[in-house]
Each structure stands twice: as C-alpha cells, then as structure tokens.
C-alpha cells in the first residue's frame, strides 16, 4: 500500500542534503526573471517527474523572495516533540499523473544517483527537545492506508492549482498581491527524477546546516475581530502557470509549520494578521476595512504582516532552519496554507487598513490588556484525548511538522490552563470541539438566569458539538456577491419573554451570533441572530421572594433599585421586570463597539434595536403597551373590573400565572368563574382588547356595554359599518366602483383607500353619504402600495396578498381607515382595557362587487314588470348517444352535465349549493341514465344582480343553431 504519512515522507531522502541559500542576500529581481544556468544541451526530463507541491518546495529559487521577511527576536526555546526515529521507505505509485506534453520541463542536471538509505537520513536530523511523548504507530497506520489518488487536488474543487511546469517566456506581467493561496495536499509518493537527486546531492555538500530552529514567534499586539477561513482563495479562477510564477513572492512567504487536517481546530483560537484580500473574507466594523480587491485590481503591494522594518530598513538576519532545503536555480511557487476561520471577541478592535491608507487606525486612549492570554486549545483535554483522534503522530508545533512547511501567519506562545476538570467521553475523535465538563459546563449561551448575571464564557468553543459537516459549512468560502437569502443558513430560533427591550439587548449583546456583510451593501446584509435563550419570569413573579435588592453586575457595581410604583397586585412583578430589562441593557451597553465603528443605516436593524434600548416607557404601563398579543388568559379576576391604579398592566392577563388562578367571565349577567386551565381552553376574548368571556354568546350580549369603554372595539365597529354602507348605498357603490374600475384599467391591480380623520366624520358619512366625505377616496396600485409598506406594517402585506387574488372584472378592494382621536373616548368613562394592537388608526378592508351598468343611467321604471332573461340549457351541439349503454353513453351524458354547469357558473350560479335537488337529478341522469322532465329555476346573475329564468333540458336533442353560434365548442366537448 502506498504510504502517505506526511511526517514520515518529509524526512525522506527527497528533502535532505539540499543546498540552502539565504534569501536575504539576493538582489531584487522581477518576479518572472529566470536565473537558471541552462546547459548547452537540453537535459533529459522524465515524464514521471514528481508534481508534488511539497517536493517542489525544496526546489525554491531565492530570487523569488523579493522582500524576505527577517525573523523576530527568538523567544526562549520551547519544548517540542522529536520526530519519529524510524522513517519509512516509499514505493512509487503506478497511478502517478504524467506531465502535460505542451509544457516545458523544469531544468535539472543529470547524472543519476541511487536513493539513500536510513543511515544517511539519521545523520541530519534536527535536534529535538529532551521531552518525549509517545508516538502512536498503530494509529499512524490508518494514514498509511489512504489511497494516494484520493489526496490529489480535484479538478472541480475551488482550490485546485495548475501544474507547475511553465513554458519559458510565458509569464504574464506582475499583478497586485491577492492574499495567500490555500495549500492543497498532493501526491507525495512519486519517486522524483534521479537527475534531480544527483543535482541535489552535489549542491548540498557545500552548505552547512543551520541549527536555528524557531517554531514559535512572538505575536504582536493586535485586536482583530475575525480571521479568514481555510479556503479563502483570492484568485477568481484556476491559477495558471503564469499566475503561479508571477505572483508577488512576499504574499506567499511562510515562516512556520503547515497544519494537518485535524490540527486546523487546534490553532483556530490564535489571532493573527493576513495580507490584503477580498472583502468578503474580512467582516469588520471599522470604516478603514478592506475594499474589495482581487488580483486584477490596481493597488500597492502588501508590505508585510507586522509594523516592523523590512529589508530596506534593517540588515537581514539568517532565516530559521527548515527541514528541507532549497535549490538555487529553480523557478516555482510556494504552497501556502491559511488557518481556519475563527471569530472571537477581543477587548478592543483594530481595523485592517487598506493597502493605500495608514495601516492601523489610532486607538482609544484607554489602556489595553496587553498581557492577556488567549488559550488556543484546552491542553489538558488535548493530552487526554490525543490517543483517540490522532491520525498524524505530531502536532504542528513539533519539529517534524516544522520540516514539512512553514506557517503563513504569526503564532503565539501559549500556556496550558491549570487544572482541567473531568471530561466526558467524546462521541467523535476530533480535537477541536470540547466535551462538556461534569457539573461545570456553564456556557455563555445557557438558559439559566444565573449564568446571564455571571456568564463566565469559554471562548474556545464557538461552534457547538454538532455534525462535522455543519461546522465545516460555517467556514466555507463565502460568495463574492454576498450570500443570497436562499443560500444563507437559517437563523437560530429565539425564545424570549414578551419584553421587546430584553430581546433588543440580547440581540446586541456580544454573545449574539452576528454575520455582517461587506461595507456598503444593502440593509439586508446584517443579521442579528440571538442564541436560543429562554428567560422566564416565574422565578421573579413570586411576591415573597426578594426582588428589590441590587443585582451584582460583572463589573462589580451594584444596580440601583428602580423607582417604586404604587403597591398593587402586580407592583412586585413590575419591579422585577424593570430590573431585568435595565440589567440586561447595562450588560449590553458595556460591550458595544467603539466610537470609530461605522453606524448602520438610518433604518437599519441595529439602529432600531439600540433606539428600543435607549427608550424608556412613558408610564408604569408603558412596557405592557410594547408587549405583543397574549392569547391565553392568565390573571385572576375579570379584566373588565376597574382597578384603583388604572394601569394597563392590571387590565391584561398574565401568561405565566399558575393553573390554580381563577378567571371570571366579563359579562355582568353571567360572572362564571373557571380555573385557569379551563379558561385557557374555551374562554373567548374581545377582538380588540384583553377582555375575556366564557362563550361567544356572553361576548355578544355584553357588546353594548363593553364598546362604551373599548375604544378600539368601537372604532373597529365603525369601520365595519362603513364597509357595509358602501355595499348597500347605490350612489356610493356606483361611485366607488367607477373609481376602482378606472384605476385598474389605468394603473393595474390596486386598492381603493377611504380615510376618516375621526370616528365622528365616519358617522357623518353613514348619515349623509357622499356629501359627508371629508377626504376623497384614493386608488393606489400594488406597486405604489409597496412604497407605503413601512408605516402600514403587516396590514400592507395583507392588502398585497388580497390584491394579487381578487378578480378585477368582478370586484374591487376597499380599505377603510378611521383615526382614533382624543374625542373617541367618552368623558368620564371607566378604565379602558388594554388594546391588542395599539396604534393611531384602525384599518379594515373587504372585497366589494362592482356595480352593474353606468352610474349615470337611470334605474328601470318600477311600474311595469321588468324584462327577465331566459336561458335554455341543452346538451352541446354534436353530442350524440345519450341513450347508449356502457361507457360511451355515460361519457356523452357527462359532457352534457359539464356544459350545463359551465353556463351557470359563468353567471355566478352554483347548482350544488343553490339548487341541490336539481344537482342530484343531473347526477342520477349521468350515472344511471334516469331521465327527468325539463326543470325551471330562477337564479340571480351575479354579473348584473338581476334574476333570470333558466330551463334545464338535459335529455333533449341539442339545438341546431348552437352548433354555429357556440364559441367554446371545443371546451364544451372536452
């Protein structure tokens, strides 16, 4: 079986004894300049030449590194694992891909040299740490069983790289740097050309190995919010050889070990910086964020990762020792890897400055926690579960991984956290997701109220323990044009109490999961998704529990008690709710973004949520007015009974009440009392307020007394009377029908709006008709209605849905709006019940049939008998064989039945509902050929509103003249 274990392969003969040339001593050349000393005769080239990107890394040309990056000051030597003491031999796979015929060969020198054995390999090993940890040969065999073809870069993948054999002179002009290109695991099992090995052996004898092993670098202080993902490819297409050879080498410069597949999650918590890249990979809130730039965009070259001197500012230093060496005469590229995506929240933020502006924005004058340690992984858990999940025998921080390749980002010197708690067994072998601790798993997304007061978040687990593909989908490459609504992941369901301020606070808190779009996009690019949090008020509801004490905030300052309200049935609960709202609001205010962060749009969701947080209720019952509708009744006593305080909170039932509470019918003549459980089952409420009755009959009986106090119920009743008056009044009906018909013919489907400034003006319209109108009716098309959707809210959506369904040739939509003015409530009335939908206007709409005829035509004279239309219905022309037996006769009778029904339905008559006896006779005629005498009915034509006489003769012969006159003959037959 072909061996593909990366650490064992990297210590093979391919990577040892190759000459190392200091990149800092070379002069600057153009990216595409070829410095290969070509022989007089072309050297032979084996088509089985290794195309592995890891092998080609050993054939680097130092001239490609135009701006080498000197290493930082070396820290104290850390303890690292030694590599395996027994590297293994590999056999060549017969499935090695051949080099393309159209590409020129990479220059190499003959003669042939045999591969070396294990003795030569042991001579040049890098000195490891005396601290040894056991390797796992049994699990290493799992990696050796992988088929090498499955490790090839697939042609359909987003990160595939073209072959590295470039034709001379084909280099395109240099383009601006486009960010790191993701590394692709490739074939490592192909024996390289013997000519290449010979050349490597000769050139490596004159180079003394460097003993500088710097696997950890001192990380600069930076406070980024997000980091790019592992597959963020800046190129918009598959890289061609020109792209690979002509990219700015500094963007491809690496200085650390490359990660393995399972070690992505090990280092995902480390903050780092990256060269400039496309905007969709950096979601920051600073105004100096990246502008979208790709490889074809003009821009200044990237100057490095950190703000320290470079080649032109300080003398070069020796490069750190790498396990492999480099050729001095090969032109190729560097395989690059990026660390996985990791969003974490630092104390402060810093912008990723654009290449052509100052790199870092001035920070706030407050002190930053410079010595704060970010744990990249729970090392205690990692050691305990290392045996369960290790496929590659060494982590990335060990020398074998340092030999394999450099890191493209800065790393941190981290210390393991002390005393890890007991662990639960993991159901999968991954090391990136932490198992919950026993009795100590207090997460920041907990449902507990105590954990909200003292969250104690553990930031190493941004993703829950879910299926592996769900975690991978969260770090995939985002679309350049932004995620479409269909392609986005569905938001997390939020279970909250009825306080809108509480929801706004949790949505803006730092524990909320935010996905921010690129700067300058539309308003829909920002998602505020709150984790699944449930805050119940049952624990705070009890009167005997202390609720007025100050809560201890995480900052250490106690919460001042809120102003007291008059003692009443709900005063203790009201204080508890206000304390909860203000406490969560203060927690959120402390974690808001700094002042330099760009504000959202004028009507963005974030601005609305913050406005809701900053607003305070006008009175003690203001919080209840913001609460949504509550369907179940939940407070003792009747809401119709006037209370001394007159608060709206007392008038609305409470959904969190106990089942032992009682509910009383609001009808004064009934006063039936039921338990809360039974009341929630069958009690009925007023349509406009929270007044409950034991049945619909009691609600109807109490309406005359209830509407005197229910303002919104009374105004809603006025709207219904106006709609009915527009149907019944002939002049109003004809006038509105003409306006609606003309509006439809000129502007398409729409709604006819009729507004009244007060309920009194609506009463004048009911008394005087068109003469009592203060505002003329207005026709708005559906397109114009969409522009006014914001103030109308859900009512606009209902109107739009009805406007798409109504039939303009038969009816029109009429919307009646009545403003609830100060004169709506009668003076001296009792306490008003809390409305369900408080607002300045009550709106209702209905479909109204179009009036028949012209409004200017005088009505027909009542003196004589009006002429009545007569309709005779027989089988359609061409129908024969009604008396035949079997399927043929049944089919003919069925066609006759369909024809009769169709003619009547065109006039708005439905036999099955209006004349069921005639319908049954026709069904028996079709099924059993049972004849019946001609039947006469007198239905009403819905198109004209006039009755007509209809004679149904189902078994008679078809009329001969209808054969010519029928315009829908084919439809009648079919």
UniProtKB/Swiss-Prot annotation:
Keyword hit for Hydrolase: no
One GO location term (cellular component): apical plasma membrane
Biased composition annotated in UniProt, kind: Low complexity: 623-636
Single biological process term from Gene Ontology: cell-cell junction organization
Location of this chain's protein in the cell: Apical cell membrane; Cell projection, Cilium; Cell junction, Adherens junction
Asymmetric dimethylarginine, modified sites: 749
Modified residues (Omega-N-methylarginine): 322, 749
Residues bearing the modification Phosphoserine: 52, 129, 468, 509, 512, 593
Keyword Phosphoprotein included in the entry's annotation: yes
Positions of the UniProt region annotated as Disordered: 23-137, 201-233, 306-326, 539-576, 618-661
Lineage: superkingdom: Eukaryota
UniProt KW keywords: Cell junction, Cell membrane, Cell projection, Membrane, Methylation, Phosphoprotein
Ranges of compositional bias, category Pro residues: 69-79
InterPro entries linked to this entry: Apical_junction
Sequence ranges of Polar residues compositional bias: 201-216
Basic and acidic residues: bias regions: 116-134
PANTHER family tied to this protein: APICAL JUNCTION COMPONENT 1 HOMOLOG (PTHR21517:SF3)
Purpose: May be involved in the control of adherens junction integrity.
Protein name: Apical junction component 1 homolog
UniProt source species: Mus musculus (Mouse)
Lineage: Eukaryota, Metazoa, Chordata, Craniata, Vertebrata
